[in-house]
């Protein structure tokens, strides 16, 4: 079952978010700490008119979510850029024992519906270059690489 998060879901979202950050930390400990977003952040995203946690449940258990937000490009005021209104997926997480069962695709489909209802033009997300399973998943559900972010340590 799919639904939007309510304030009563904060604790479960926090637990899933902690699991996500443990995985992200294992992939890039130079970027991520193995701790979740603060509960106040989760609350603010639930209460915001521009964002939602899309929840997927199995037998009334939250098994995954996608955090999506409506965004306007900061470059819209510059003539050299095409105006851009889009959805951004901050996070998409499914519990390990529920992966490869279609829940991730269901979340992407619902996020797409969410964005279309707001007349947004695209959905963006970030994925670590060494998160091969996530990259393969996003490729399967239609995401394409369109920009590469580079970093040089000094």
What are these regions (language model features)?
Residues 1-15:
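A short beta-loop-alpha structural element at the N-terminal edge
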Residues 21-43:
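Conserved GNAT-fold acetyl-CoA-binding loop/helix
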Residues 43-55, 88:
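A short helix-loop-beta-strand connector motif used in the catalytic cores of GNAT acetyltransferases and
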Residues 55, 61-70, 88, 93:
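Conserved beta-strand in the GNAT
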Residues 98, 102-110:
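Conserved acetyl-CoA pyrophosphate-binding loop and the N-cap/start of the following alpha-helix
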Residues 110, 125-134, 151-154:
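Conserved beta-strand-loop-alpha-helix junction that forms the acyl-donor binding cleft
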Residues 138, 143:
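Conserved active-site tyrosine of GNAT-family acetyltransferases
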